[in-house]
Amino acid sequence: MPIRVPDELPAVNFLRNENVFVMTSTRASTQMIRPLKVLVLNLMPKKIETENQFLRLLSNSPLQIDIQLLRIDTRESRNTPSEHLNNFYRNFEDIQHDNYDGLIVTGAPLGLVDFCDVAYWPQIHKVLHWAKEHVTSTLFVCWAVQAALNILYGIPKQTRDSKLSGVFDHQILHPHALLTRGFDDTFLAPHSRYADFPAGLIRDYTDLEIFAESEQTGAYLFASKDKRLAFVTGHPEYDALTLSGEYHRDYEAGLNPEIPFNYFPQDNPQLEPRASWRSHGNLLFSNWLNYYVYQITPFDLRHMNPTLD
C-alpha cells in the first residue's frame, strides 16, 4: 500500500532507498481514490526512527494511506528536532473533531514508571476515549497495550522482575482468525519490555480474544471481537539493529543488561544480528489494515458507527 506522507518528511528518501513505495501528497492528490486515514500517536523518544519503522510496515498494499502524526507530550524533545515536530506533527486539539480509519499507538520507554507519574497520562486517557467515537480500529503496541488495558479494562500495571529482551517463538491459537491469516503456525517476533501480559489475566478480566502467545512472553496478539481494538505486546516494527542499539546503550551506561535472547549470532554482541521477523511484521500490519480497517470502515468518515461502550 503506498503510504501518503508530506513531501518533505525525512522518511520519504529513507524508505525509497529501501525500495519501499512512498507516495508524496503532491502525487496522491491526482488520484481519484479515497485514502485510508491513519493517525500515528508516536510516544517514542526517537520519533524519526520510529516513523521509519512503522511507515515501512504500512507501505505494502494496493490502497493509499494518508498518514498523520500525532504528539501529546509538549515538553521539549531531547531526541527529535523541534523543527521536525513543528512541521510534521499535529497536537490533539488540531484533530479532535476529525475521524480516522485507523489509529496506531506506539510503545514508550516507561515500563518502570507508574501510570500516575507519566507526564502525559491524562492526555493518553483523552485520546483513548476520543478514539471510541472517532476511529474505526486502533492498534496498540507494547507499552501502549499496558496503558490501554488499564484505561479501558481497569487492569493494574503488571511488571516483570527483569526486562524481557530478545526474539521469541510464538504459537498461533486460532489459525482461521483474520488477524493471523497467513501466519506460520509458529513465528518469531522481538520483545523489549518490562511490562508483563499473562494470558490468564487477559482471559479472566476481559472479553478480548488471544490469537498468539508464547510461554516466555505471555500473550502476544489479541483483539476485541468487534475489531475496534487490536493489541501486540512485542515490537514487530523493529529494525534488525534496534535491539542491538538498546543493548549497547544500556551496557555502556553500566546497567549490566542481559544479552537479548535468540538475537545475536552465537550470543555474541560484537556480531551483527539479522532480522528474522520481517515477514511476520509485514503480514500482521497488512492483516490489520485489510480486515480491521479497510473492510469495516465507512466510505464517508462522517458516518462513523462506534460500537465501544
UniProtKB/Swiss-Prot annotation:
The keyword DNA repair appears for this protein: no
Keywords: Acyltransferase, Amino-acid biosynthesis, Cytoplasm, Methionine biosynthesis, Transferase
Catalytic function, reaction form: L-homoserine + succinyl-CoA = O-succinyl-L-homoserine + CoA
Signal peptide: none
Compartments reported by the entry: Cytoplasm
Site entry (Important for substrate specificity), positions: 192
NCBIfam families associated with the record: metA
Name of the protein in question: Homoserine O-succinyltransferase
